[in-house]
Amino acid sequence: MTIKFLSESTINRIAAGEVIERPASVVKELVENAVDAGSTKIDIILERAGKNLIIISDDGIGMTDKELEIAVERHTTSKLDESDFLNIHTFGFRGEALPSIAAISKMLITSKKQGADKAFQIKLIGGNEKQVTVSVHNEGTKIEIRDLFFATPARLKFLRADKTELAATVDVVKKIALAHPEISFSLTHDDRNLLKFKGQNKDAETNLKQRIIDVIGDDFIKNAAYIDFKTPDFSICGYTSIPTYNRASSEDQFLFINNRPVKDKLLQVALRVAYQDYLARDRYPLCAIFLQIDPQLVDVNVHPAKAEVRFHDPNYVRNLLIEAIKNALTNKSHVTSTTIASDALQLFKNPLVNKQPSVSKAVSVNSKPADYRPAMSPSFKPTPNTACQKLIDTLPHAKIEQEVERRIEHEQQVHKQYKLGAAKAQLHTTYIISQTEDSIVITDQHAAHERLGYEKIKDYLKTEELIKQRLLIPEIVELPNERKADCLYENREKLYKLGLTLEKFGEKSIIVTEIPNILEDVNVQKLIQDLADHLSDFGENIALTELIEHVTETYACHYSIRAGRKLSADEMNALLRQMENTPFSGQCNHGRPTYIELKLKDIERLFGR
């Protein structure tokens, strides 16, 4: 076959295949264009999840008839200065979106330039039959996309169910709406309003907070730490959830670079590292984090859909993000999720009666109904029986030394002033019940002490080496490639301080002679394989932190107070005071709460008071 030039329509369809994967891709490109046009209001209408119809309307600057003709040609844009290609501040800049979408659909664009007398309209079918006519329209632009992928039936065949495609579009709109709280957004599907976000015109922090409440929810804000971190060429702001408020998936993690939503592996790893001391590996924090960086230090032109970025100094960015998140979490290190207490109260209101053993319905002939009360007239008012009260008052009381009683009362009053209150009782030798001025607190003694031990051992490992145990038979670990073996060998001195002694054994193998004493039952093969993976994929800091976490968790769990151990009042109060003075004592090492606080007003509501 001879080499030949492709037709313009074929080129556009190929470009569409790179940029336009599904209806959500169309919505993303067109809404981003509307944002770049300076819109304050953007409305999206869909039919059949966008397969039949997509309409995007905005009140932006609009276009003239000449601009309409140029806009649907490839590589035409108003957003890119050729002399400064690296200094990009807009969403779009390649000039590919409109012609790519037009090539695979039936497109109608109606637009009126701000201050102009007339509106104009252009119609394209499969990218052809371009015709500009005079029309009637308000200032701004409306783009209608019908029969998406009609020109590429193979792509249409691979679209998912309407529900799945719609969910992808909703996700796209939420991300763009989060990045632009000053703009109003609405999304309607088959005449049903799905999203409606009102634009905010207050200060930036208030605008962002309200938009996050609209998109992610009020519970998130109540259980999130505010991030405000700045360097001369870098700033990070947003909200990230406290460890006890987490999810089973990462779908509520929103990350932005210069207001551009991205899914970047480096940023996701940084997020994981920031939380690895506080969350189990199968749990994920929620966040909406915005990184502002000099455009010349980040390349957004590495992916057709601009969903990925490349940093000039990725390690610097990663470390700053980890530091910013940890600083924010430290400010809320003693707080547990507000939803935990509400969930507990809900269980009180609706006990799991179905899980209780069934009770025989047989009743004794002499038994009375549980709610039996003697009949009395509505006007009846009981009067106090003073004689009975006097009799009760004369009953003997336990003989308690007055001085001891006063001392205990004084100590209780002092302890009640603390955040976790004064210890009152121990339930099932597992849970500490304490009282504050306006609540009761239930503390899991094992989880709490494990966290305290974890933090103490972490501090110890910063200055001291771990006790090592020599293996009777050294373990030889064969790795997939030489690069991973080299990564381990290059970090052998740091691993030695953590109790791991190893040497190279051939090109792709490592021989382990000593391990941390506390990890006597560890699977050495798996430990070394995991370390090698983390060192090669994520870098030295993350891999070594993973090992420290593993060792520290084992120590903390082994030496912590066990459930089932009886504690004195002094021991319980001492544990509570330690928790108040220890960072991140509100959750165990797996993100579960160490205590639950029930407010007195909520308890009173349970009893209808």
From Swiss-Prot:
The keyword DNA repair applies. Coiled coil: none annotated. One of its GO terms (biological process) is mismatch repair. It comes from the Bacteria. Keywords: DNA damage, DNA repair. InterPro entries: DNA_mismatch_repair_CS (IPR014762), DNA_mismatch_repair_MutL (IPR020667), DNA_mismatch_S5_2-like (IPR013507), HATPase_C_sf (IPR036890), MutL/Mlh/PMS (IPR002099), MutL/Mlh/Pms-like (IPR038973), MutL_C (IPR014790), MutL_C_dimsub (IPR042120). HAMAP family: DNA_mis_repair. Belongs to the DNA mismatch repair MutL/HexB family. This is DNA mismatch repair protein MutL. It comes from Rickettsia felis (strain ATCC VR-1525 / URRWXCal2).
